[in-house]
Amino acid sequence: MPQYRSRTSTAGRNMAGARALWRATGMKDGDFEKPIIAIANSFTQFVPGHVHLKDLGQLVAREIEAAGGVAKEFNTIAVDDGIAMGHGGMLYSLPSRDLIADSVEYMVNAHTADALVCISNCDKITPGMLMAALRLNIPTIFVSGGPMEAGKVKWEAKIIPLDLVDAMVKAADKNCSDEEVDAIERSACPTCGSCSGMFTANSMNCLTEALGLSLPGNGTTLATHADREKLFREAGRRIVDLAKRYYEKDDATVLPRAIASFAAFENAISLDVAMGGSTNTVLHLLAAAKEAGVDFTMKDIDRISRHVPCLCKVAPAVPDVHIEDVHRAGGIMSILGELDRAGLLNRDVPTVHSKTLGEALGRWDIMQAHDKAVFDFFLAAPGGVPTQVAFSQNRRWNELDMDRAKGVIRNKANAFSQDGGLAVLYGNIAEKGCIVKTAGVDESIWQFTGKARVYESQEDAVEGILGEQVQAGDVVVIRYEGPKGGPGMQEMLYPTSYLKSRGLGKECALLTDGRFSGGTSGLSIGHASPEAAMGGAIALVEDGDTIEIDIPNRRIALAVSDEELARRRAAMEAKGAAAWKPANRERVVSAALQAYAALTTSADTGAVRDITQVQR
């Protein structure tokens, strides 16, 4: 029987000093025998997805204490990728994932907490906490802040749904008036919550449902809706039960590594492919699998992406469907239900809320559920009132979207495409693979051949696109923006947004060893591995080279001979210390980012640390 970890600092005469300090935090005599539950909150006033979380940790804490536990809350950092986008701030986004993972580990282990509630929401916070949970392997449950309501703007007598990406695209469109841009800016992000499309934050929160580490509805229940409060309260009660099952009944099935098994990771990427999730999820799932000790690789993602269909298209893949619409169609449990009926799901994996995922689907998938409370739960609608207050409205749709032929969620027979929403491409320019979000690519350009227009940084690429250097038929190549080369693997949302604003969204491709925002659509291929700074062939591309992209056959190729590539590689190596570095790029890289670059690995392994460099 495992002993409560907290007994290390709460039991025995020699711990009188530690108990004195615990008492100073408010603990009393009867508390020292209870499980100590850490609450990792990520409240910050910098990020709309986190601005409403300030009091929610204590909401969870009260439920923990009512259920017989002791709750101790702490905070970790959160970076807003949208605000950090397009300038040096984006260098810090991906590295913050590792800092978040470390900070949670530090706090939980330093204070010997028994279990963990992760209150996350946005792009790097959920992945960072997920990595920490799998590293710590103590009972853990995730509850996110929830998605933002979609924006709506009235323009020329039309009500137009929109989101953050629309603001970026329209701002760079010379045909849009200042008045229209201002109206969109003021309407694009109306409430607290993670941005309203199937961007990285919402994708990751949905994937925690598939991994079995969060409650049904975690990924899709709006931040503003009263129903989300139920998830926070249930998480507080549930974590005490999980802790007691492990420490008092020796039930190891409640541990994160038992739940997030290889089969669960297969379910997560199947969901990702089916819902056309952000390409960043690939990076984060690979990193999480590494922490879990699960041998889940790009080859597994490639394998799954070839036979799982695209069952759901959400902004940015389509302009008028947002996460609130997915919720109305039954949320993530209903997408998983369709995968299950297609024979594409591992049903027998445990979750934090049910004995098996299959059992959970029987209750929560609206196509097979019988509980009126479940139907009512998925009728939760946007309130339509700008606010930064959580749980501030209780509006309901009149009816659910249960149309699996033409609705937001489709069944396999009526899939948007039998090819999934994500694909891994391989070739001489990306020998270890690269990722494209096919759900956001018009099928007319799934096969594309163009001339390379090469840039050594995102900033130069933006200047080239807005300066009209890039023309229809070009393949924009942005290199030395990988985890090591950036450093920090910047997102390329501005380049793709500016291509759209120039009307080139279906006329050009973009290839990078950096990554893309979940808000990106178009023929945008990222995570090219190995990256340029680690000797990848993307560093050898020259202006005017022909690049061939073939999504159906999962192929990408630089149309030069092996001999020519070898010649270019030899010429690069001959540069000595200047080899595999960007030419004429001026960029201030802080000591913190240099330390990150020294240990990070390429995108095909999740950009995790190479700890062999520090192990003795």
UniProtKB/Swiss-Prot annotation:
<dbReference type="GO" id="GO:0051537">
    <property type="term" value="F:2 iron, 2 sulfur cluster binding"/>
</dbReference>
<dbReference type="GO" id="GO:0009099">
    <property type="term" value="P:L-valine biosynthetic process"/>
</dbReference>
<comment type="function">
    <text>Functions in the biosynthesis of branched-chain amino acids. Catalyzes the dehydration of (2R,3R)-2,3-dihydroxy-3-methylpentanoate (2,3-dihydroxy-3-methylvalerate) into 2-oxo-3-methylpentanoate (2-oxo-3-methylvalerate) and of (2R)-2,3-dihydroxy-3-methylbutanoate (2,3-dihydroxyisovalerate) into 2-oxo-3-methylbutanoate (2-oxoisovalerate), the penultimate precursor to L-isoleucine and L-valine, respectively.</text>
</comment>
<feature type="binding site" description="via carbamate group">
    <location>
        <position position="124"/>
    </location>
    <ligand>
        <name>Mg(2+)</name>
    </ligand>
</feature>
<feature type="binding site">
    <location>
        <position position="123"/>
    </location>
    <ligand>
        <name>Mg(2+)</name>
    </ligand>
</feature>
<dbReference type="Pfam" id="PF24877">
    <property type="entry name" value="ILV_EDD_C"/>
</dbReference>
<feature type="binding site">
    <location>
        <position position="122"/>
    </location>
    <ligand>
        <name>[2Fe-2S] cluster</name>
    </ligand>
</feature>
<dbReference type="GO" id="GO:0009097">
    <property type="term" value="P:isoleucine biosynthetic process"/>
</dbReference>
<feature type="active site" description="Proton acceptor">
    <location>
        <position position="517"/>
    </location>
</feature>
<feature type="binding site">
    <location>
        <position position="491"/>
    </location>
    <ligand>
        <name>Mg(2+)</name>
    </ligand>
</feature>
<comment type="pathway">
    <text>Amino-acid biosynthesis; L-isoleucine biosynthesis; L-isoleucine from 2-oxobutanoate: step 3/4.</text>
</comment>
<comment type="pathway">
    <text>Amino-acid biosynthesis; L-valine biosynthesis; L-valine from pyruvate: step 3/4.</text>
</comment>
<protein>
    <recommendedName>
        <fullName>Dihydroxy-acid dehydratase</fullName>
        <ecNumber>4.2.1.9</ecNumber>
    </recommendedName>
</protein>
<dbReference type="InterPro" id="IPR042096">
    <property type="entry name" value="Dihydro-acid_dehy_C"/>
</dbReference>
<keyword id="KW-0028">Amino-acid biosynthesis</keyword>
<comment type="subunit">
    <text>Homodimer.</text>
</comment>
<feature type="binding site">
    <location>
        <position position="81"/>
    </location>
    <ligand>
        <name>Mg(2+)</name>
    </ligand>
</feature>
<dbReference type="InterPro" id="IPR000581">
    <property type="entry name" value="ILV_EDD_N"/>
</dbReference>
<dbReference type="InterPro" id="IPR037237">
    <property type="entry name" value="IlvD/EDD_N"/>
</dbReference>
<keyword id="KW-0411">Iron-sulfur</keyword>
<dbReference type="InterPro" id="IPR020558">
    <property type="entry name" value="DiOHA_6PGluconate_deHydtase_CS"/>
</dbReference>
<feature type="binding site">
    <location>
        <position position="195"/>
    </location>
    <ligand>
        <name>[2Fe-2S] cluster</name>
    </ligand>
</feature>
<keyword id="KW-0479">Metal-binding</keyword>
<feature type="modified residue" description="N6-carboxylysine">
    <location>
        <position position="124"/>
    </location>
</feature>
<keyword id="KW-0100">Branched-chain amino acid biosynthesis</keyword>
<dbReference type="GO" id="GO:0004160">
    <property type="term" value="F:dihydroxy-acid dehydratase activity"/>
</dbReference>
<comment type="similarity">
    <text>Belongs to the IlvD/Edd family.</text>
</comment>
<keyword id="KW-0408">Iron</keyword>
<keyword id="KW-0456">Lyase</keyword>
<keyword id="KW-0001">2Fe-2S</keyword>
<dbReference type="InterPro" id="IPR056740">
    <property type="entry name" value="ILV_EDD_C"/>
</dbReference>
<dbReference type="Pfam" id="PF00920">
    <property type="entry name" value="ILVD_EDD_N"/>
</dbReference>
<dbReference type="GO" id="GO:0005829">
    <property type="term" value="C:cytosol"/>
</dbReference>
<dbReference type="GO" id="GO:0000287">
    <property type="term" value="F:magnesium ion binding"/>
</dbReference>
<keyword id="KW-0460">Magnesium</keyword>
<dbReference type="InterPro" id="IPR004404">
    <property type="entry name" value="DihydroxyA_deHydtase"/>
</dbReference>
